Amino acid sequence: MVTPTTIRTVDLRSDTVTKPTESMRSAMANAEVDDDVLGNDPTALRLEKEVAEIAGKEAAMFVPSGTMGNLISVLVHCDERGSEVILGDDSHIHIYENGGVSSLGGVHPRTVKNEEDGTMEIGAIEAAVRSPKGDLHHPVTKLICLENTQANCGGRCLPIEYIDKVGELAKKHGLKLHIDGARIFNASVALGVPVKRIVQAADSVSICLSKGIGAPVGSVIVGSKKFITKARWLRKTLGGGMRQIGVLCAAALVALHENVAKLEDDHKKARVLAEGLNRIERLRVNVAAVETNIIYVDIPEDPKFGAEEACKSLEDVGVLVIPQATFRIRIVLHHQISDVDVEYVLSCFEKIFHS
């Protein structure tokens, strides 16, 4: 095992920290570009066409971030202020997107408990639906949102059968289904199922190009042609219309072509790291829950040495991780982490938690 006598930097804060590869930089430098607001950037059009085909949807649109992609999607489906969206209480849209659906869109979030596996209980979702024929004191439900993989639950993959059932429930009540698929490629690789099958029941999907596959910037949202037409208006309204975005889309195309195949290796390294951490006497990892590239490490409940202090000690030896809770640390693997890095991280954790 590598010992932490020689400090190296291993950045496990997120899979968004990756640096553009040489092939990405070359593609960016040589990208064919035009004005995307006018709808003429050929590289953007190529990326959008390819992602739409991968997801099995009619059309797609590049957006600067996943937060904007989710916000636009919710606002297209909930086109009347005061509409309601049902989503997980531990979902990214609910916790990490500044409440944009309510503050900017006037959409009311109605949360349902996320189970440990990332799902929401079907009966609980149905019980949360509020009809336009119901009590006039309540907002009207228009949309259900799922997240796949579910990050706060540890990068868990939602089963296809479950997504299909939620889709059936949405149709039964005249609702739309949006999937925050920031790490949908991780789910696809882990489940061994094409993306288009996973999102078959969804009316729209937001797919991150940075998380998982390591492009430097952006997300793509997919849906029907009608959905994307409305989404373009909202993107412009929110300031997300950009000009020669082919420079960014070129890197994303490289990520799609080169890095999806690396995700399986990311998942294997995550499993090795999780098992190694779980063997350290004072640490606990639910290894069975490590399905993709995210690990949560529970540390001893020492009021003088919580996750904040542990992360600082790890940073001092070059290991960059994030406190998830008072006594929990989050680790995210990506394609620029090597086997040697994994060994080094294990040795650093062992040294810190045995000292």
From Swiss-Prot:
Similarity field: Belongs to the threonine aldolase family.
Traits of the deletion mutant: Lethal albino phenotype when homozygous.
Reactions mediated catalytically: L-threonine = acetaldehyde + glycine; L-allo-threonine = acetaldehyde + glycine
GO cellular component labels: cytosol
Pathway the protein takes part in: Amino-acid degradation; L-threonine degradation via aldolase pathway; acetaldehyde and glycine from L-threonine: step 1/1
Keyword field contains Lyase: yes
Signal peptide: none
Enzyme class (EC, first level): lyase
CDD domains xref list: TA_like
EC id: 4.1.2.48
Cofactor: pyridoxal 5'-phosphate
Molecular-function GO terms, alphabetical: L-allo-threonine aldolase activity; threonine aldolase activity
Record's function text: Threonine aldolase involved in threonine degradation to glycine. May play a role in the removal of L-allo-threonine.
GO BP annotation list: threonine catabolic process
Protein name: Probable low-specificity L-threonine aldolase 2
Keyword DNA repair: no
Tissue expression profile of the protein: Expressed in roots, leaf vasculature and flowers.
InterPro entries membership: ArAA_b-elim_lyase/Thr_aldolase, Low_specificity_L-TA-like, PyrdxlP-dep_Trfase, PyrdxlP-dep_Trfase_major, PyrdxlP-dep_Trfase_small
Keywords (A to Z) from UniProt: Lyase, Pyridoxal phosphate
Pfam families tied to this protein: Beta_elim_lyase (PF01212)
N6-(pyridoxal phosphate)lysine carried by residues: 211
